[in-house]
Curated annotation (Swiss-Prot):
The keyword Transmembrane helix does not apply. Pfam families: UCR_14kD (PF02271). Component of the ubiquinol-cytochrome c oxidoreductase, a multisubunit transmembrane complex that is part of the mitochondrial electron transport chain which drives oxidative phosphorylation. Keywords: Electron transport, Membrane, Mitochondrion, Mitochondrion inner membrane, Respiratory chain, Transport. This is Cytochrome b-c1 complex subunit 7, mitochondrial. Signal peptide: none annotated. It comes from Saccharomyces cerevisiae (strain ATCC 204508 / S288c) (Baker's yeast). InterPro entries: QCR7, QCR7_sf. It comes from the Eukaryota. Belongs to the UQCRB/QCR7 family. GO terms for biological process: aerobic respiration; cellular respiration; mitochondrial electron transport, ubiquinol to cytochrome c; mitochondrial respiratory chain complex III assembly; proton transmembrane transport. It is a peripheral membrane protein.
Length: 127
């Protein structure tokens, strides 16, 4: 069974609240992010989430228009950069403080709505 974004967010919160796990996992995660290279293409982490599922489609529809345009621009620019086999100039790389989860709140909201709808669709009435 694939994990939901809600469960992944809970695991992340648990790791960040635990001092031992935080000291162990955060440096590894930061190194992984640096090696992944998506920031060098001008992408944020939320730009990498696959769009081909109903939850993500709902979250993208709920995204504010200006953020949606910024997302599309970042993705198109990254594709163009990849086609030319270059990286963006260092001053255009996404910095760690700029890489905030702009889409995750909408994904969690859409997941909660889908879960509630599923529970209501499968409700059993007992006497």
């Amino acid at each position: 069974m694939p994990q939901s974004f809600t469960s992944i967010a809970r695991i992340g919160d648990y790791i960040l609240k635990s001092p031992v796990l935080s000291k162990l996992c955060v440096p590894v995660a930061n190194q992984f992010i640096n090696l992944a290279g998506y920031k060098k293409l001008g992408l944020k982490f939320d730009d990498l989430i696959a769009e081909e599922n109903p939850i993500m489609q709902t979250a993208l529809r709920r995204l504010p228009e200006d953020e949606s345009y910024a997302r599309a621009y970042r993705i198109i620019r990254a594709h163009q950069t990849e086609l030319t086999h270059h990286l963006l100039p260092r001053n255009e790389w996404i910095k760690a403080q700029e890489d905030v989860p702009y889409l995750l709140p909408y994904i969690l909201e859409a997941e909660a709505a889908a879960k509630e709808k599923d529970e209501l669709d499968n409700i059993e009435v007992s006497k």
